[in-house]
Amino acid sequence: MLNNFLGKNVRIIDDDNMEWRGYVRSIETPEDSDDGQWWLDIVNVNKPGFETGLSISEHEIKEISEII
């Protein structure tokens, strides 16, 4: 499911109820990750301190939607 967001602008609510917005630059599949989870690499993140991007795992994501 998360692979549908590759190359899209997204809005994410994480497990701490924080909102993140950015562009999904790459995805790591469960087969490729060390912990067997999906991972999203987000760039152009809307929060100070995350200028180089954000990596977030599937279990940290409560909600995700495409920003059109």
What kind of region is each of these model predictions?
Residues 2-68:
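Conserved RNA-binding domains used in RNP assembly and mRNA/RNA metabolism
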